[in-house]
Amino acid sequence: MHFSGVAFILISMVLIGSIFETTVEAGEGPKSDCKPDLCEAACKDLGKPMDFCKDGTCKCKD
């Protein structure tokens, strides 16, 4: 049971990361208040530091 919880969290992180990766690369997507903690986590999943997070856009440093 503990393992399934860990697996669920990992799968969720991958799905969230892929959504943010698409938003970061395409520069479009749902416009909403950018959440710095989610943006930073998405950039960390890509192996990059967060550059900025404003106007619903998450940008990672290259």
From Swiss-Prot:
<dbReference type="GO" id="GO:0090729">
    <property type="term" value="F:toxin activity"/>
</dbReference>
<keyword id="KW-0872">Ion channel impairing toxin</keyword>
<keyword id="KW-0964">Secreted</keyword>
<feature type="signal peptide">
    <location>
        <begin position="1"/>
        <end position="26"/>
    </location>
</feature>
<keyword id="KW-0732">Signal</keyword>
<keyword id="KW-0632">Potassium channel impairing toxin</keyword>
<keyword id="KW-0528">Neurotoxin</keyword>
<keyword id="KW-1015">Disulfide bond</keyword>
<feature type="disulfide bond">
    <location>
        <begin position="39"/>
        <end position="58"/>
    </location>
</feature>
<feature type="disulfide bond">
    <location>
        <begin position="34"/>
        <end position="53"/>
    </location>
</feature>
<keyword id="KW-0800">Toxin</keyword>
<dbReference type="GO" id="GO:0015459">
    <property type="term" value="F:potassium channel regulator activity"/>
</dbReference>
<comment type="function">
    <text>Probable voltage-gated potassium channel inhibitor.</text>
</comment>
<comment type="similarity">
    <text>Belongs to the short scorpion toxin superfamily. Potassium channel inhibitor family. Alpha-KTx 18 subfamily.</text>
</comment>
<feature type="disulfide bond">
    <location>
        <begin position="43"/>
        <end position="60"/>
    </location>
</feature>
<keyword id="KW-1220">Voltage-gated potassium channel impairing toxin</keyword>
<protein>
    <recommendedName>
        <fullName>Potassium channel toxin alpha-KTx 18.3</fullName>
    </recommendedName>
</protein>
<dbReference type="GO" id="GO:0005576">
    <property type="term" value="C:extracellular region"/>
</dbReference>
